[in-house]
Amino acid sequence: MDNELPIDSNMLYNYLRLSPADELYHYSYATAWTWLINMTGKQEPTEADITEELLDLFVGFVYDRFYYLGSSAIRKYDPNHMVLGSRLLTGFMNQPWVLRFAGLHLDCLTFNWYGEWDIPPEKLAFVSQNANAPFMITEFYTKGMDSGLDNTRGAGWVVKTQQERGDFYQCYTLRLLECKNVVGWHWFQYIDNDPDPAVIYKEVNGVLVWKDQSSVDANKGIVSNTHEPYTDLVNSMTEINKNVYKLIDHFDAKDAQTATAEE
């Protein structure tokens, strides 16, 4: 269902200011004004009637419609597959109405969650409580300067070594394992980006392929461009991955002890 959709608290203003004469957007324009009329109870509301609460509610309204239409179509024509949403960006984790409607329509929410060494438990709890659904992290990574790559591209933070990348992986995923609603994660990505930032087009099997400029010259992979594993990173990943279920049992037992002590 698309990927990394935009989040804008001024979405309502943007729709209201569309041109009603524009064939591409006149339905969106009319829908926004009809919504505002219904929400304010006024026949001729103005932008002065818009509150912060209405701005948040309209964002939820848009995503409710998007997820309803998308999930309904997928379930009609592809009923045997889960609906995983749109890989929400980090900014969505504090949008309660988006989370609630996503949880209503999706089988599992997905997030590309950057900007945290480990995600604070209160943020994970906020997503869990509002979505009331399982979710997974579909992108996260750091880049190591010891790779020899420039590392100026991409959303992941920069660290000094591959061991520090491994430390980040362990810290980040241990926090995820503490959260009962998290069902998995996906490191971005398997192989490093091309080290040549000047290459925008590259011939692959006789076909000219365009490369996104965010996908060059960065140590995102668990293997290099020559398919050599970053051993320190891989070993740290393996240590966590082989013990996932034991770690879940540990955190569950810890939660049970805390709950018993509070009774």
Segments the model singles out, each with a brief description of its role:
Residues 1-97:
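Polysaccharide-binding and catalytic clefts of secreted carbohydrate-active enzymes
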Residues 40-56, 90, 130-172, 179, ...:
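Active-site clefts of carbohydrate-active enzymes
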Residues 64-72, 121-125, 169, 173:
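Generic structural signal for well-ordered alpha-helices
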Residues 74, 109, 139, 185:
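Conserved, mostly hydrophobic/aromatic
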Residues 78-83, 104-107, 131-135, 178-184:
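Loop/turn elements at helix/coil->beta-strand transitions in domains of secreted/extracellular proteins
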Residues 83-123, 191-202, 214-217:
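Substrate-binding cleft/loops of secretory-pathway carbohydrate-active enzymes
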Residues 188-263:
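Aromatic-rich peripheral "rim/lid" segments of glycoside hydrolase catalytic domains that contact
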